[in-house]
Amino acid sequence: MLCGIDEAGRGPLAGPVTAAAVILPSSFDFSILKDSKKLTEKKREEVRKTIYADPNVIWAIGWASNYEIDEINILQATFLAMERAYEGLYLKLQEFCKLNNDKFIEPDIIVDGNFIPNIKNCSSIKALVKADDSVYEVMAASILAKTARDRMMIRYSWIYPEYGYEKHKGYGTKKHIEAIRFNGYSPIQRRSFFVKNL
């Protein structure tokens, strides 16, 4: 059994970093999966809905806030989000096995990237560069992490409309930097991230 883990939102100047953990059944339509960066926003949403609608897909989302990013740095906050995502998936997997009278087996984990988070309760864990382009479970995780974070940033735009989060999702675009310059930092700004010419 394989669990894929990936993150979204390491680079933005605002908002949380998000991670997803996913286990896919053999019956899943793998042909719809790609690295989230290679899909349009509309297509990512379509795939997200397909994943959510499949009762045999086990998934969970984890978050680390901008405050946690500022306190422990973006790499450690990314690991924290991944650990939280896996903890959620682990509980769902236990419940899934119990409901289906299946034997519970701790999954093997593949994490996209170079670094391995401190995840317990797994059979094995390894990091694989570009796993989001080669491992279906990680592709699915990249899509869920990206869409979850995008939806969160859209919700933040309702609270802080002057920053335009619904458009740039917190990334350091010219419009975002201009909004920070004019309005000051919002409560979801990452204070530890250096912004040139601010």
Curated annotation (Swiss-Prot):
Which controlled-vocabulary keywords does the entry list? Answer: Cytoplasm, Endonuclease, Hydrolase, Manganese, Metal-binding, Nuclease
What is catalysed by this protein?
Endonucleolytic cleavage to 5'-phosphomonoester
Annotated ranges, domain RNase H type-2: 1-198
Tell me the organism.
Answer: Treponema denticola (strain ATCC 35405 / DSM 14222 / CIP 103919 / JCM 8153 / KCTC 15104)
Which cellular component, as a GO term, is one annotated location?
Answer: cytoplasm
Enzyme Commission number(s) of this protein: 3.1.26.4
Q: Which family does it belong to?
A: Belongs to the RNase HII family.
Q: Name one GO biological process term.
A: mismatch repair
**What's the protein called, per UniProt?**
Ribonuclease HII
Localization (cell) = Cytoplasm
Top-level EC class, please?
Answer: hydrolase
Please list the residues that bind a divalent metal cation: 6-7, 112
The entry lists its GO molecular-function terms as:
manganese ion binding; RNA binding; RNA-DNA hybrid ribonuclease activity
The source's domain of life comes to: Bacteria
One matching Pfam family: RNase_HII
Q: How is the cofactor bound?
A: Manganese or magnesium. Binds 1 divalent metal ion per monomer in the absence of substrate. May bind a second metal ion after substrate binding.
Its cofactor is: Mn(2+); Mg(2+)
Function (record text): Endonuclease that specifically degrades the RNA of RNA-DNA hybrids.
